[in-house]
Amino acid sequence: FDQLAVMGVNLSEDMSAEVDKELALRQLSFAQLNDSPEVLNALEEKMIEPLCRRLRQTGCSGAFVLLDATVNTRMEGAEHSRAGLYVQKSGADTPTVPLLLYRGSAEVGKDHSVMPHRKWRMEFQTDQFPDYDRWMTPGSAPLYQSYTLTERFELPGTSEEVQLFLLPLRGRDGTMYGLCGFEISESYFKQNFAQPAGFDRLSCLLAPAGDGLAADAALSSGTTGGYYHAPRNTLVLRSMGGGLT
């Protein structure tokens, strides 16, 4: 996942720069993006092409940028509603695979040949976003030390299980603009990370690591020619000797 880290840092820098430029152009503070649908729409218009380009260049199933602002602070549920873009690959990971808009302005998406997802909504719901408040806590660590992998969760409105590779969006002055990163779906991981091993049965996990591997919060795959059993408990790491764990 070194590529994800590099591309994630590039994505964060690109998206933060777009926000910085738009705020400077309009002489606004970031807080003034709330209740400014015209400005938020202009930002999405500028962000969608570089976001789609990064998605096509990266081994993942989706890419997103979430801004900590909403088009209407007076609507019901506005405290959890956030603007941004979330784009997914609609099929096999090929250079020309069509892209779908899961979150963001439908008009902006259509103008760039990104059609709305069947579960499209205009804005993110942060109460359905894993540990949103935690990831939005300002930090000073450089971007290459600031990425993280969420636990597996069900993408709202779908039956797809995903993990998100997250990075912060920070302004030149350190203001937290939001989050960005990449999606790795369960189906994508199974298809693209099955191992060409000589074993009949092999389990591969993408899991948050701590004292052990939280298998119940992980994505899993097997071998290209066999089958596997996906564990659902926390796995404890033990040395087997000879440099093996």
Language-model features, listed with the residues they occupy:
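Extracytoplasmic/periplasmic sensory segments of membrane signal-transduction proteins
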Residues: Q3-T137
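Structural recognition of the beta-strand scaffold that forms the well-ordered cores
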Residues: F64, Q163, C180-G181, C204-L206
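Acidic surface patches and DE-rich sequence motifs
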Residues: L67, L155, G171, A207-A209
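Solvent-exposed loop/turn segments at secondary-structure junctions
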Residues: T70-N72, L155-P156, I184-Y188
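A short acidic (Asp/Glu
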Residues: M75-G77, S159, A217
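Extracytoplasmic/periplasmic ligand-binding sensor regions of membrane-associated signaling proteins
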Residues: G104-G181
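Intrinsic low-complexity, intrinsically disordered coil/linker regions enriched in small/polar
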Residues: E186-T245
